[in-house]
Amino acid sequence: MTHEFTESYDVIVIGAGHAGVEASLATSRMGCKTLLATINLDMLAFMPCNPSIGGSAKGIVVREIDALGGEMSKNIDKTYIQMKMLNTGKGPAVRALRAQADKSLYAREMKHTVEKQANLTLRQTMIDDILVEDGRVVGVLTATGQKFAAKAVVVTTGTALRGEIILGELKYSSGPNNSLASVTLADNLKKLGLEIGRFKTGTPPRVKASSINYDQTEIQPGDDKPNHFSFMSKDADYLKDQIPCWLTYTNQTSHDIINQNLYRAPMFSGIVKGVGPRYCPSIEDKIVRFADKERHQLFLEPEGRDTEEVYVQGLSTSLPEDVQKDLIHSIKGLEKAEMMRTGYAIEYDIVLPHQLRATLETKLISGLFTAGQTNGTSGYEEAAGQGLIAGINAALKVQGKPELILKRSDAYIGVMIDDLVTKGTLEPYRLLTSRAEYRLILRHDNADMRLTEIGRDIGLVDDERWKAFEIKKNQFDNELKRLNSIKLKPVKATNDRVQELGFKPLTDAMTAKEFMRRPEIDYATAVSFVGPAAEDLDAKIIELLETEIKYEGYIRKALDQVAKMKRMEEKRIPANIDWDAIDSIATEARQKFKKINPETIGQASRISGVNPADISILMIYLEGNGKAHRKY
């Protein structure tokens, strides 16, 4: 079929949420003429649910986005109202930043960034169809009948894809926050042959700040110590006038109200059909599943500096409006609270992610990429990370360059994408530190060391950032080398000082680096014995040195595991392999291999239901050039 195109682009991104913004900025910055199409320009980078960025594992993803040259990190550093480092009492592997955002300012700042970006056209329009010829993308069709040509298309439609809002017995077609739903595109994605799933998520009510009795709640302030998501942000710019959050709880009265109205809850009446998020359940779901709990935490989170709206985190619900009011008034501090917006549930279509390659390109259609909640994830950060990778790979494909695949040992983004394309997901996927087997090397403090060179190679890290990174890396490397070269000897003068500080004396000579491995010895103590570095070191470099030195043994073990897995990842599986020709593998393994079509032995080994014996047979088959274990 010959199409008459009115406009032509290298890449078209459908949807301007957190995934779409990162995808379009990446493609345009890599030199591709890009169109970012959105149903509503006023909702670009909008936060329809929680007004925050970061959190456990998620905060590390934002740092990874920054190291690769993405935008979310810089934007939240410009627009937060509170910053907090989580899990400071635990090990470095699980520490992560979380920021409360001024949600309106966040969206405005990101829109301004997109508007001034070269090579990027921003357009309010509804995309109804993906145009495909001979198994590859050639463009898109708008609701008004316009056809735009494209060499690659990235679908980042979020919860708008056949979205339906549910509130009590009310159910109607809608995207998030009462925006338009994308129904025709959902129909046409299915017609293209993609397998579609149905998920559900929800949001809590918002209450008016001036109607809250804060004296009945517990204050939750931000941190005084400067922290940032972007490695380029300066401590001098750290916000001093932060806005606190507040903590309160549900109680038995709250639980009674919910239990008495379960028959009216869409979650239990059968109105909700989609699968909801395990790690962010509705309050009615929590009350039923954890009936033994006397109370549940609720955080009152301001939505911005210039608004009265307060987000009641932990109270996600689709109960009828009258029940929501009663529920709110049962909570300490909210007895007279004015509900400004009701909570609601939203159901939406997803593209089942086992149909994707690790580049986030669909296996079915060349040049068609998907990212974000479209792939079955939850969260702004997960969406932004996928959007960045999808955008990068769309640009690389258009330019005929090698693709970028982040491994599980490279980044949490790599863990997430590998989980999605290898295991799929039966519920909205959320990143957790427990999902990463190499979390000690995927830390908050070393994201730039892991990924900045990759960002530079693909063209997203500019000269200023690259110079700053080189300076930091050289300072780190030089100081590590110095600490490993200076010896402390167990002489009287040294041991007298050691014992004065309350530490065990030295029995053997050791390097300053070995001295620092002692749990009680920090960098400042070590250099008091061996002298300072040639130049003043930033506190973040010192933190990195302490972590790398104190956990060196564990880090080395993790790197050994990475090297072992790398050998399996390098063993490619032919795309046209005949799984039925391999004798002796288990039926379940054969079915999973056919469904997912893994690209490497490493990926095959991570598929649920596949055991080591199946992998051994597969490797023997491949090593025999397809002759061993072939059926005749």
Curated annotation (Swiss-Prot):
Location comes to: Cytoplasm
Give one GO biological process term.
tRNA wobble uridine modification
Reply yes or no: does the keyword Ligase apply. Answer: no
Q: What is this protein called?
A: tRNA uridine 5-carboxymethylaminomethyl modification enzyme MnmG
By sequence similarity, the record places it as follows: Belongs to the MnmG family.
**What lineage, starting at the top, does this entry show?**
Bacteria, Bacillati, Bacillota, Bacilli, Lactobacillales
Q: Which GO terms describe its molecular function?
A: flavin adenine dinucleotide binding
Q: What do we know about how this protein assembles, alone or with others?
A: Homodimer. Heterotetramer of two MnmE and two MnmG subunits.
* Required cofactor(s): FAD
Organism (species): Streptococcus pyogenes serotype M18 (strain MGAS8232)
Task: State the disulfide connectivity.
Answer: none
Q: Which UniProt keywords apply?
A: Cytoplasm, FAD, Flavoprotein, NAD, tRNA processing
- Function comment: NAD-binding protein involved in the addition of a carboxymethylaminomethyl (cmnm) group at the wobble position (U34) of certain tRNAs, forming tRNA-cmnm(5)s(2)U34.
Coiled coil found in the keyword field: no
